[in-house]
Amino acid sequence: MPSVKVRDNEPFDVALRRFKRSCEKAGVLSEVRRRETYEKPTAVRKRKAAAAVKRHAKKLQRERKRFERLY
């Protein structure tokens, strides 16, 4: 859980904004949403495999664009 120490003479709004930003970077909300319901192990494996395929396709697309610019 991210924590934020409020500095002297720091407005509450600024501290709250820093806390929200640290929660976003840590992925707290996405983790909570993901754990709201039970996900079967097969569904977890399927989701991770689909994410890996998507990452690989994205990587290939970036490489192709890079080589296109060279010519």
From Swiss-Prot:
UniProt record similarity statement: Belongs to the bacterial ribosomal protein bS21 family.
Classification via InterPro entries: Ribosomal_bS21, Ribosomal_bS21_CS, Ribosomal_bS21_sf
Assigned keywords, A-Z: Ribonucleoprotein, Ribosomal protein
GO BP, sorted A to Z: translation
GO cellular component: ribonucleoprotein complex; ribosome
Organism: Chromohalobacter salexigens (strain ATCC BAA-138 / DSM 3043 / CIP 106854 / NCIMB 13768 / 1H11)
Keyword Ribosomal protein: yes
Protein name as annotated: Small ribosomal subunit protein bS21
Superkingdom classification of source: Bacteria
GO molecular function: structural constituent of ribosome
